[in-house]
Amino acid sequence: MELCNQNNHITAVSGDPLNWNATAEALKGSHLDEVKRMVKEYRKEAVKLGGETLTIGQVAAVARGGGGSTVELAEEARAGVKASSEWVMESMNRGTDSYGVTTGFGATSHRRTKQGGALQNELIRFLNAGIFGPGAGDTSHTLPKPTTRAAMLVRVNTLLQGYSGIRFEILEAITKLLNHEITPCLPLRGTITASGDLVPLSYIAGLLTGRPNSKAVGPSGETLTASEAFKLAGVSSFFELQPKEGLALVNGTAVGSGLASTVLFDANILAVLSEVMSAMFAEVMQGKPEFTDHLTHKLKHHPGQIEAAAIMEHILDGSSYVKEAQLLHEMDPLQKPKQDRYALRTSPQWLGPQIEVIRAATKMIEREINSVNDNPLIDVSRNKALHGGNFQGTPIGVAMDNSRLAIASIGKLMFAQFSELVNDFYNNGLPSNLSGGRNPSLDYGFKGAEIAMASYCSELQFLANPVTNHVQSAEQHNQDVNSLGLISSRKTAEAVDILKLMSTTYLVALCQAVDLRHLEENLKKAVKSAVSQVAKRVLTVGANGELHPSRFTERDVLQVVDREYVFSYADDPCSLTYPLMQKLRHILVDHALADPEREANSATSVFHKIGAFEAELKLLLPKEVERVRVEYEEGTSAIANRIKECRSYPLYRFVRDELNTELLTGENVRSPGEEFDKVFLAISDGKLIDPLLECLKEWNGAPVSIC
């Protein structure tokens, strides 16, 4: 909605008085385009605050600090802020009765005082009711630094709109603290986000006023007193609060909405990652790509589903794995089910609604961080204070509860896909547990990781339970309904962290599967070559070099190799307890039984040559299998890795080359967790964003045409 601000009075000028059109307009375009915009804003060097244009990406950038984004205040906002501050002073001087200026607070607002400044100091004192635990070094009861920085940024943005009765100089001081990486210590718990985040925000006010119990953390993590913090930030002196200023600082939703902003920044990126990993899952599982066909999803109408399918379709379009899988399905259509299982086939239908929920929550929080959410509001143009309830953080609680449920659903899909990937009953020829070593009896691959994934998924599903239905009546039944916005944001932050753990484990497993497919292809080529050589030498050529009719058995024995999963026998390829040798023997016996007349002649008998065939194969095949493994380990495989011809390659390259991870085997000392840590830290630091978006750089925002 376009707004007109005349003399500090907002009026609707767009014909959209209820803001529904603006809300719908904000959802135009693809989710991926929105994520790209978010990332672009995250990487800007400066964030200019004016009150109405703050974005999720900007909040995440300032929250995570590191000197990357500096905060500037729009000078044009100064006049409106000053006008509301002066109105409060003039109102009090006239003797006008105003909530929180001349009255007590909440259920005790019947009390009156003319000591406006003292009242604000008392507000900050009694709200400093948080618990920090053993001391400044203990972080278990202290709000994380990024969350506090997000809260500071959002609160300044709100107050800049000029409806709160606070001096511009106080907002400048908070901005200096942000830009100098000085962060007040706020309690982790103690707010119900209605009437705003009173308790945690009071500690920011406490630092600004120099309360002796106030602490801050400096750029290097050092603990600072209020005096030390102000000196480092270049703020000359503590503030003596004027009437309404304490209330303006504490009576808002900035802590809950600030944390929600950083949470949703990550959640949106993880949602896109889940789409790309689902496509990679289809590649390594030799899936059938028709599950992404646009007509299927167009007929369902849901935009999230249509986009998820289109993204997966784009990744799979032209994929070398898909081309190879199509050949396999055509060669032996009965070798695998007609349809893939739900974790693959319905992944767009599953992910689509979750992405719609996360996107809607993102827009809801983006509106909240640009809202005026304290009480009372100062309307200078009408010369009045408006007593309302914008401090009620219900949009935060609802958005976070919904997002957490969506995050849990994404995690559930990852777990289902991961479970198929490590199970040799379902994974179309990959080894059990994705074991990459020579001896499966001494290599259990991702077995521990699968147990960990079950743990992550269980905790994530528990966290999906709502927070907002646990409201308790507070503050002498004045705050009898309250949003629990920050609590819900905190739980969603936990959920996002667990989804990062799951994404990490799953992505490393997908890269392991890619490498195993590469090894499988080279092994199969070597096995076919060895079997072909022995068949020619033993079965089709007589003692004098003459060809026998049994040469046709070569085609059949090679078909056995084609149809047998190479990892079902690769650790001991000539073992008669494994299917390869059993089936080769069976096919030769079948040939012998099919032609008794030929079998009567020892020169042409296939049956009499079975022993020689197996003996020669036992001499050649193990050497060939070992040769292929050595070449793979040395990076000299005859067949290149197919992943390089796929749009999912940037993710694989990032995990393998940039993070220096490798195929996990029982032969190496490196544990799975060591590799997972590398990827988890990269995801947490935002380093996965570029390779993820590189996978989709050629996508035009539309599905492949069905015409």
Curated annotation (Swiss-Prot):
pH-dependence note: it reads:
Optimum pH is 8.4-8.8.
Q: Where is the active site?
A: 99
Name the InterPro entries on file.
Aromatic_Lyase, Fumarase/histidase_N, L-Aspartase-like, Phe/His_NH3-lyase_AS, Phe_NH3-lyase, Phe_NH3-lyase_shielding_dom_sf
Listed A to Z, the keywords are:
Cytoplasm, Lyase, Phenylalanine catabolism, Phenylpropanoid metabolism
* Posttranslational mods: Contains an active site 4-methylidene-imidazol-5-one (MIO), which is formed autocatalytically by cyclization and dehydration of residues Ala-Ser-Gly.
Broad enzyme group: lyase
Pathway participation: Phenylpropanoid metabolism; trans-cinnamate biosynthesis; trans-cinnamate from L-phenylalanine: step 1/1
Its GO biological process terms?
A: cinnamic acid biosynthetic process; L-phenylalanine catabolic process
* Temperature-dependent activity: Optimum temperature is 46-48 degrees Celsius.
Record-listed 2,3-didehydroalanine (Ser) modification sites: 195
**PROSITE patterns per UniProt:** PAL_HISTIDASE
EC number of the protein: 4.3.1.24
Q: Which GO terms describe its cellular component?
A: cytoplasm
> What is the first-listed, main subcellular location in coarse terms?
cytoplasm
Q: Which residues bind (E)-cinnamate?
A: 251, 339, 345, 375, 447, 475, 478
A GO MF term: phenylalanine ammonia-lyase activity
Which catalytic reaction applies to this protein? L-phenylalanine = (E)-cinnamate + NH4(+)
Is Cytoplasm set as a keyword in this record?
Answer: yes
Position of the 5-imidazolinone (Ala-Gly) cross-link: 194-196
Where found? Cytoplasm
Please give the subunit comment from the record. Answer: Homotetramer.
Q: What does this protein do?
A: This is a key enzyme of plant metabolism catalyzing the first reaction in the biosynthesis from L-phenylalanine of a wide variety of natural products based on the phenylpropane skeleton.
Checking PANTHER family in the record gives: HISTIDINE AMMONIA-LYASE
| NCBIfam families membership | phe_am_lyase
Name of the protein described by the UniProt record: Phenylalanine ammonia-lyase 4
**What's the name of its gene?**
PAL4
